[in-house]
Amino acid sequence: MIDLRNSSPKILVIGDLIIDKYLWGDCDRISPEAPVQVVNIKKENIVLGGAGNVVNNLKSLGATVDVISVIGNCKTSILLKGLLNDIGVNTEYLVTQKNRIVPKKSRIIASQQHVVRYDNESTEEINIESQNLIKEFFNKIISFYDLVLLSDYGKGILTKELTQSIIKSAKKHNKKALVDPKGLDYFKYKGAFLLTPNKKEASEASRVQINDEKTLTKAIIQLKDEFQLDLSIITLSENGIAIYDDNLRIHPTVSREVYDVTGAGDTILASLGFALSCSYDIDSAVKFSNLAAGVVVGKIGSSTASINEIIEYESSLNKSSSEEHIKKFE
């Protein structure tokens, strides 16, 4: 593979910015008020989630990144801008919509176990004014980027009309648009370069229950043809990542003890986009993404993988595993 350590592609991310809050503690008793655990909080940390985690992953890989999204005029929005500034990301293209709620997901981790999550959010679609500002920003700056990533968490930023406008404009400027999809209406992503649904999402979108290689092939072709994609991809969790252009192949995942899958989809999207921007072919890009995801799931919380971590991880793998390129779907 091409050495990516000195690569810095310019990538534009558009989507739902989320705040991820982690409360860490321990638990050694049951509440007298109800049959629930009492967690003694020892520390907390707040990180970028959703499209923000895609941005964070790209920065960790060495990309130059900008983000387009919509925030409100609340304290969470101020916090979000601060987190982006902390990693050197420009907030010039964040549209402020009055009374817009920035989603915040709070997780309690007790003795290294994820106990509960509670959310503060709104899934209401952004207004027409915000959509028009995003289109204006996008059309003004798209020529400066190598690639576009759309991170849809179903929180109202990527409306159907806006998403189609972005994809069509990206094509007009000869820029690949990669999408991490959400929901059942995949026609909003029609014409994208590729989508990154997991097996469950792909089954729902294609209306094909995936349970073997035959049904996987049917579903992945259906997605490519129906939604006019350049490539069709389905992530298969422990079974790897399936790709279809003119033929099906499955790149296996690499063995690692899984601590937390939070944000693994963000890592797949970010690392695929990064590798493709650095002139990787799709198979090499998927292999790179599998390695990046392997690093991330070995950590707790919305995490990232650096180029050096990925190189070290690949080096640590058993030789027979690292040389196995493709395995059949199981």
State each model region's role.
Residues M1-D28, I326-E330:
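Positively charged, low-complexity intrinsically disordered leader regions
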Residues I2-L4, K10-I11, P32, V36-P103, ...:
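Substrate-binding N-lobe of the ribokinase-like
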Residues L12-I14, R117, D146-L149, L178, ...:
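Structural motif
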Residues D16-L17, Y153, T267:
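Active-site metal-binding loops of divalent metal-dependent hydrolases
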Residues L94-R100, R107-F144:
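Conserved phosphate-binding/catalytic loop of the ribokinase/pfkB sugar-kinase fold
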Residues I109, A192-K200:
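Non-cysteine beta-strand/loop elements that form the S-adenosyl-L-methionine
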Residues E125, F144, E161-G191, V208-Q209, ...:
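Conserved phosphate-binding/catalytic region of the ribokinase-like
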Residues F144-I157:
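Short acidic, glycine-rich surface-loop motifs adjacent to enzyme active sites
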